[in-house]
Amino acid sequence: MSVFGGLWRSAVNLCQSSRLFSTGSCARIRMHAIPKLKEVDRWTEKRSMFGVYDNIGILGDFKAHPKDMIRGPVWVRGFRGNELQRLLRKRNMVGDRMMTEDRHNLQKRISHLYRRFNRHGKHR
């Protein structure tokens, strides 16, 4: 029994861990060289426009809201909500102008999400 205990202690000291199970070999990771830094373009359009509309209220007499400056689909601008709410908003805003197949796929997704939200989740 003492032989087993001695082997166990040496194995623990060798790997410097106190696990009761083996995770494979205990070879340490060696870094032979410092990784090279990535070349990052700091003046891409996205990075250069970051924070442009932060002071729109202070500098512009609070006439424009930052959500009015956002470029994108009408039903997404300044909107926070889940996928079902976003799709319902899209259907209400542009549903009558959608192509037949797109509207059909949208309606299928909405009905699927209705079923999912009504069967699962916190608020049932």
From Swiss-Prot:
The keyword Lyase does not apply. Pfam families: MRP-L51 (PF10244). Residues 1-31 form a transit peptide. GO terms for biological process: translation. GO terms for molecular function: structural constituent of ribosome. Its main location: mitochondrion. Keywords: Mitochondrion, Ribonucleoprotein, Ribosomal protein, Transit peptide. GO terms for cellular component: mitochondrial large ribosomal subunit. Transmembrane segments: none annotated. It is found in: Mitochondrion. Component of the mitochondrial ribosome large subunit (39S) which comprises a 16S rRNA and about 50 distinct proteins. Belongs to the mitochondrion-specific ribosomal protein mL51 family. This is Large ribosomal subunit protein mL51. The lineage of its organism: Eukaryota, Metazoa, Chordata, Craniata, Vertebrata.
